[in-house]
Amino acid sequence: AASDVYKRQIFNKVTEELRRLGCEVKVYAEKDFVEQGVKGDIIFDMARDKATIARLKSLEDGGALVINSAYGIDNCVRRPMTELLIKRGVPHPQSFIISTADEYSENCYPCWVKRGDSHAMVKEDVAYATCKEEVENILADFRNRDIPVAVINEHLQGDLVKFYGVHGTDFFYWFYPSPCSHSKFGLEKINGIAKGIPFSVEELKIQSDKAAEALNVPIYGGDCVISADGTLRIIDFNDWPSFARCREEAGGKIAECIYKRAKKQMK
């Protein structure tokens, strides 16, 4: 997939930048990392596989510095992400967490029904609904696929903005996704082409950094909706995205973030 190519490119770029800073970097495929029982004091990763994440957690528990933390990666699963962002006061749509076996009784339409137990893996894991019947159909599909929990977000009108950031650095990049560019879940189609509603980029960076702290993912990306009055609300947050449009600049800043944290760890 194109996104895998982009992810490999940013990972390679960070490796290159860390070597330029004088670090010795060894790169492993996830499978080899787990099977060979690789150890390390400082590890950076773009892990997705459950076995890798479990292995990283055990290394973290033993004192290793892992960026992004395997615990942080798990925090980006829809349900814990929603709970942690709301708890930390990060601006977020009205949300409900329900068992897929239960009836949805809130009167919140239109809305997005999202798989709650993992990252979205297929487009059916996030669906738009305008009435109770549509929500019930989506929940039935989740049940059929053994998905136990759903997160329901109110649909927000406004401009969809995507962003990338690196906590602890001045790096922050945002853009309007075009309706045709690797549309994530069709929100672009429903919200239409961005109108360019003015908003505070500084405020978006502050809230994004706050979300990164709440979730424990210093290298992050996400989506937010800017309402007509300029209010911003974060609707999605990801650990270590592809940084597809700003790879050159981001690579150096991610390396700087890892390097700074590594030096602190070694004191």
Regions found by a protein language model. Give the residues of each.
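A short beta-strand motif that forms the metal-chelation/ATP-contact edge
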Residues: G40-F44, C111-K114, F163-G165, G230-R245
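Short, small-residue-biased leader/transition segments that mark boundaries at the very start
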Residues: A1-Y6
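C-terminal active-site "lid" helix and adjoining low-complexity regulatory extension at the edge
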Residues: K13-E17, F199, E213-V217, I226-K267
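Active-site nucleotide/adenylate-binding loops and adjacent lid/helix of ATP-dependent enzymes
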Residues: E60-G63, Y71-L160, E202
